[in-house]
Amino acid sequence: MHRGHEPTTRAIDAQKRYYDLRAPDYLTGGPADRGTGASESTISLLECRALVDELRPVGQVLELACGPGGFTRELARHARSVTAVDASPQMLARNRIEVGAPNVRYVEADLFAWEPDTAYDVVFFGFFLSHVPPAAFEPFWEVVRASLRAGGRVAFVDEDDRAAERDEVQLLEGVPMARRRLGDGREFDIVKVFWNPDDLAARLRDLDWDISVRRLDAGLFAGVGVDLRA
């Protein structure tokens, strides 16, 4: 998947820098991307476990944008192996410390330029889809498609449109962005797209995915489904 669109590339680079700097105090159980002093949607470790237990991700699992490890830990309990990919070396270091599972392999890569080297039984991403710029949405889902074995499943968790009331999103060069502040006062703009679950399911159906997207508590949604082209 190629970034292409220059505003999208700038947005992705700023977003990566923010998460590099946020890694040391990022919560393992939720998005926690609003920075110091802000209201945050979080998902407890028990909720992480319940969602992954429901998914039952056996075999080889790919986790995109693995972050500090809240979901990685639970995926590793079920899977034969987990490949955890993230653009941030600081997040990967935090994940290794938090998870410490022998069946997890870590890959540092820009997810907007990365290509899978094998196919997986399950592809999972938690709190990442809302950070995918509109211009990268279809290319991102082609990466997901290329990562899945025939009969494989994709699953994800994220904030939905109800969470938009906690944020202020502005279009910057056509990319929906939200302002985040670090503890030292520095500010960054990150991509933030709040999907309505029905709209997301319909959009994915147009791309030949059969994915059920349901609302959860606390302004979150979960999706699971299959590639109709497989």
Residue ranges of model-derived segments:
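A conserved beta-strand element that flanks and buttresses the S-adenosyl-L-methionine
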Residues: 124
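A short glycine-rich, Lys/Arg-flanked "PGG" loop and its adjoining helix->strand segment in the class I
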Residues: 138-150
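Conserved class I S-adenosyl-L-methionine
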Residues: 2-56
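Short catalytic micro-motifs in class I SAM-dependent methyltransferases
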Residues: 127-128
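Conserved beta-strand signature within the Rossmann-like core of class I S-adenosyl-L-methionine
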Residues: 151-159
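Conserved Class I S-adenosyl-L-methionine
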Residues: 190-226
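C-terminal alpha-helical "lid/dimerization" subdomain adjacent to the S-adenosyl-L-methionine
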Residues: 159-203
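Class I SAM-dependent methyltransferase SAM/SAH-binding core
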Residues: 62-113
